[in-house]
Every structure is written in C-alpha cells, then in structure tokens.
Amino acid sequence: MMRLRTLLQPWLDLTDADDRPVGGLAVDSRDIEPGFVFVALRGSRHHGLGYLGDALAAGAGAVLWEPAGDVAPEPDERTAAERAGVPLIAVPDLGRRLGPIAARLYGDPSARMRVVGVTGTDGKTSVTQYLAQLLDREAHRCGLVGTLGSGFPDSLQPGTHTTPDAASVQRTLARLHRQGAAQVAMEVSSHALDQHRVAGVRFHTAVLTNLGRDHLDYHGDLAGYAEAKSRLFGVPGLQWAVLNLDDAFGRQVHGALAGGTRALGYSLAGHPQAGVRGEGLVLEPQGLRLRLSTEWGEAPVQAPLLGAFNAANVLAVAAAALSLGVALPVIVERLAGLRPVPGRMEPFTRPGRPSVIVDYAHTPAALRGALAAVRAHYRGAVWLVFGCGGDRDRGKRPLMGEAAAELADRVVLTDDNPRREDPDRIIDDIRQGAPGRDWPVLRDRAGAIRHAVERAGPEDVVLVAGKGHETVQQIGDRCLPFSDREAVVQALGEEEGA
C-alpha cells in the first residue's frame, strides 16, 4: 500500500509525522472508508471542508484540503482531527493536482489501456455506448464511463455524474483494468474539463460530436463553453482527434490541433478534409443505411438506429474504431449489431398502438434532430411531449418551443425537473417561441404521456423528449421516482418495450 509521503512527493514534502498508508482517495465524504484520504476541494457554492466532520467520523486517515480565501478547518475540527491523529494538509491548487495524484495512487491505469474520450453537446452517451458495444469482446474487453454509469456494456454500475470526480475517475479506470479492460470509452463533459476531473487521464483518442447551446448557466456564454470543450484536444500525448467537420466548432478544433495529434474528420455532407464520410443516407422504419467511404476503404453500412444524427454518431464510432486499428470489415459487421441505448431514440411499440420514442433531447439542436428523425422514419403524425428543466438556461426554452412548433404536428407541454423554479414560468418561456399555439399543458408527466399515446393513431409516432434514461423527477428539493420509459410502457398497456 502506498504511503502518503510517497504519494505526494512530486508536489509536497511531508513530515514523518504526517506519513501513513493510503487506502484510497475520496472527494465525497460518503465514500470514505477507514484509512482513506478525504479530499476537500473548493466548489462554486460550497467547500468540501463543510463535510470534514463526516469524513473524520467515517474513519479518514488524512485530509487534503484546498486553500480558498479565508476558508479553513474550524478550530473544533482541528482539535478533533488532532485527537484522532489525522493530519490536515493544505495543498495549493489541489483541484488541478488531484487527477495526477489519484493516477499515481492507482497505478496510472489509463497508461495500461487505450482510452477514448468523447465530448460534445449532444451524442456523447450514444457514441460511447455504441463504441463500447463495437469494441467489447470476451478476449478484448471495453469499459465504459459516462452518464449511464461505469462498467461494461452489459453490466453498468449507476453513477451520479456524466464524468465522475478526478479521484473516482482514476479509481474506476483501475477497477476496469483489473476486470480485464484493454480499452475504455469515456464521456467527458464540459464541467469535467473545466473542473479538471480528467486531469491525469492519458487519452489515446478524443472525439468531438458537435457544439450547441447547453450549460450556459454554468459557463456564462458559448465561448466559455467551447473553450472548456477544446481542452480535451490539447491533452499531452493525444494520438488521434476524431472531429465532426459538419460542425463549425469541429472545423475550428481541426485547424488548431497541436503537432503530434493526427486529425480524423468525419462528415455526412462530403467535407473534403474528412477521412470518414457517409454517403447516400437512407432512413427506414428499421434503422438507417449509408455508404461508408474512408481512407481505409469503402463499404455499405446498416445500423438499427433512428435519425440522421445517429448516422453522424455511426461515423464518429467508425472513425474512433479506425483510430484504434479495428479493420473496416469488422467495423461494418459490428455496426449492424448495435443495440439502442436506453433513453436515446429508444423505440417502444405495441400492435395497433402508436409507436413511441423516448429520447434525452433537452437542447434545441437535439430536439430538432429527434423530431426530424421521427418525421423521416414514420409516416403518420408526429406528437411531442416535452418540457424544460428548472433553474437552468432560460434562453434555450423559447428555442425549443420554436423547434416544436416547426417540426411537430401535436404538442403536449409538461414538467421536466422543475426543481425550485415556478413550473408555470418555464411553460411560459417555452411558449414565447411558439406564439399563437394553444398547446395543452399537463403538469403531471405520466398523465401527459398517457394523453398523447391515447389520442395518437396507430400510424402516428409519439416522441417523449427530455429525460431519456433518468429515473427521477426533481421537484423542489425532492427527487421523486419517475421514468419516461416506464410511463410509456404503462401508457401502451404492455409489460416491456420493443
């Protein structure tokens, strides 16, 4: 077991009195086990020192804390720590240093695997899931880290963040390596990049899906959001950058890549610099087909996925697999066997009833893409059930209302994690993008889904957008159990979706 003095030697020179074995690192006091080191970071609203008492009670063997203004351990906490023999060690710039510290503790696991990081406004979850499905084989396993959890495609442990904290990232990578992973597909959010959660991860390939409007409540503006995303493509040692050249930001990153990183662009629009192109896209009820043209050859591709945006995701997956050395014929064969990702354009059907699609679309671009997809794949009227999250970017709400007015035939407005915000104000913001539309409002989300499913015809399609895989509805400070997927199954009157 590594000792604390050895662990921190590149950054701090500890005294013998502070030295002790390190059982693990934890940012969340609830994850502390006896002998773990509690890491107290400064946050945008709170400092981890607020949970110092909980960490000491759980058996923390030492505490690393990040200086921030006048924030410091309270006198009574210092006394309690001293009595327990627990050193409180101030580490300047700990937020930036935690990733490399954790990597050192857990044996630098990403150096022993090939890690693919996927970032972008929309498509991160789908691309990582599809890539892991394509790569994962019994003798050559591919791990997953992302919104749906961590593990392997057939066995995920639920998580709380798209990208976990820096200590958890390294601990998870070490676990996946022990379990046989030779490669890992990881979602990398803008928050994670801004907060240095993937510092210390040695990425082999970085993928950009697109850049649209999201998380402006955190980043302030689109420029700040873009700057955070771009950091993934400047990490030391990055070998490949897989970039969507149909996206303006993708082209910008392509032109700014540092030497030593090879660019592999992909395009559905025939961009001349794209090494992976999709041509002749056809959308059918059972999925999509196109011709894949690459620097490694050409081949027809079929995939059981819905939407032109999923065609772009297929290109991203193919390009990432090519960057890892997977042969084109193998890629084509495995794309045909992809399984839908829970809550990502996931179809539910029952004979004689409308088709229902559950999708996570919660940005204007994603909602437009999902609506365009169901319009292309189905012949009947397009129904839409959606709302917008509370205490988040208000500016996107009228844009989503505008998308609904343009692309849906029938719309039912409902709640989608209103949190502490007045749900009526959220609905009013959405309506600003669709003046004159008298859409029904059913605040109860299950009731709204049932309303649409009961009124839609058997040739129609109902898109339930916004929550996807989520299993709670956030109302006020409460997280109440709720699943769009389960509500759809109940509305269709069957036990499971197709």
Curated annotation (Swiss-Prot):
Keywords recorded for this protein, A-Z: ATP-binding, Cell cycle, Cell division, Cell shape, Cell wall biogenesis/degradation, Cytoplasm, Ligase, Magnesium, Nucleotide-binding, Peptidoglycan synthesis
Record: residues binding ATP: G120, T121, D122, G123, K124, T125, S126
GO cellular component, one term: cytoplasm
Chain sites annotated for binding meso-2,6-diaminopimelate: R392, D416, N417, P418, R419, G466, E470
Motif (Meso-diaminopimelate recognition motif): 416-419
Entry cofactors: Mg(2+)
Catalytic activity entry: UDP-N-acetyl-alpha-D-muramoyl-L-alanyl-D-glutamate + meso-2,6-diaminopimelate + ATP = UDP-N-acetyl-alpha-D-muramoyl-L-alanyl-gamma-D-glutamyl-meso-2,6-diaminopimelate + ADP + phosphate + H(+)
Location(s), subcellular: Cytoplasm
Enzyme superclass (EC): ligase
Positions that bind UDP-N-acetyl-alpha-D-muramoyl-L-alanyl-D-glutamate: S29, T162, T163, S189, Q195, R197
Pathway assigned in UniProt: Cell wall biogenesis; peptidoglycan biosynthesis
Gene3D superfamilies: Mur ligase, C-terminal domain, Mur-like, catalytic domain, MurE/MurF, N-terminal domain
InterPro entries from the UniProt entry: Mur-like_cat_sf, Mur_ligase_C, Mur_ligase_C_dom_sf, Mur_ligase_cen, Mur_ligase_N, MurE/MurF_N, UDP-N-AcMur-Glu-dNH2Pim_ligase
List of residues that carry N6-carboxylysine: K229
A GO molecular-function descriptor: magnesium ion binding
Keyword RNA-binding: no
Family stated for the protein in its record: Belongs to the MurCDEF family. MurE subfamily.
HAMAP family named among the record's database cross-references: MurE
Job description of the protein: Catalyzes the addition of meso-diaminopimelic acid to the nucleotide precursor UDP-N-acetylmuramoyl-L-alanyl-D-glutamate (UMAG) in the biosynthesis of bacterial cell-wall peptidoglycan.
Protein name per Swiss-Prot or TrEMBL: UDP-N-acetylmuramoyl-L-alanyl-D-glutamate--2,6-diaminopimelate ligase
